Amino acid sequence: AVAPSNRSWLGVARELTAGTALLPTNTIPQEARSFAPEDTPRFLPDEAIRGSLALRYGNVLGPEDATFSFGGPAFLDTYGFLLDNIFGDLSTVGSSPANGTSLNGALAVGGTVAVLTGGTTTTYPNGGTVQIDSGGVSEVVILSQAWTGGTIAFTGDPLRFAHANGATVTTVTSPFTHTFAMLNSALGYGGITGSQPPTHTLTDNTNLNFAGSPGTNTSGARAYPFACVSQFDLTLNSEQLVSARFQGNSFLSLPATAAPTNTVSTSLPVAAWQASVYIGGTAAGNQVTTIGELAISVKRKLQVIWTLQGNANPAVIARGDLDITGTLNFTDPTDETPLSYMLNNTQPLVYVVLDNGLTGASHLKVTFRCSQASFTKAKPERGQMLMAFANQWESIATSADTGGSGGLGPGVFTLLNSTPTY
């Protein structure tokens, strides 16, 4: 028997408890052979001298974790899982609100039950899509229990924000607009102290099994729990598809608990020429049409921490500072404006919009906003035919680039698609 590599696939699921592996809920299409998970146990050498001229007398299994990287054309319906992982502050607004009611009592971060002032089993059924609150703290949940005596439950979507008594509640439909910002609240995902975003299980479906002990695998897949993204790179080249790449750390892999289901995205990648770039002024003004390529890089510091706990896996993979940088290649400049961004240190807004131009369930749109971008490089280049500038910028954290958790942030992504929750 053989296992063709093109029949392998990558699955993702948001974990309800950090480090507890789940079967994938969605498949993330990727470039062939780009998914590179690797278990990285440390081996502790015994090199104590004992009367011989050998160097090593044993390797003792030490602490364990894993790394991963993958990428390819950007699929704007599934990559929200990874944006949520690296940013942590996620608010969502649905469309066509109906069956309006309100909360009968305040809700805390991490809650999975709400009491409503109105509603019925018909208007709030099991599996229904419900929006709680509005503005920066709006969130969408999928009901795991129909309205019963005024109570709804959503065990798969613990609340990310606190909600006041009387906050609005409605049923909603697609499309959904998701806003990703840096999490700054004291309570992180699931109501755990420490401003930590959610973790995910990445599943590598290899179609390879193993019969033996320990580690028998009959699922044909390996799960990488507690996956934390350390870097996300988005690249737009005017002659290519929009591409994205992710990398990070996770716990050591283990056999998936069952054969996973391949839930493939039906969306298509987007050509980069469909993007619009704005520099300075407001988000809707100052369009710049001389940029041939741009890149946005989001980096999150991670620290893998092991403790004396009788387990070789990490105690936690901690998330720290988040930074956003980027490049803008002005391949057709008409003057020295790209140079002036650096020399004058104007630190303008950088705003990118990518819209596939479709409608209904096929409509996909992503925007990125950095309200204060410090241009640190503007190198003149001599292209094949024309003069050009290769610019680099660094984000400056401001109150304009935040979500419902407040504070200061370096930038914000929004996604519009038909995916209700991440």
Task: Label each residue range with its predicted role.
Residues 1-422:
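Signature of extracytoplasmic/envelope-associated structural regions
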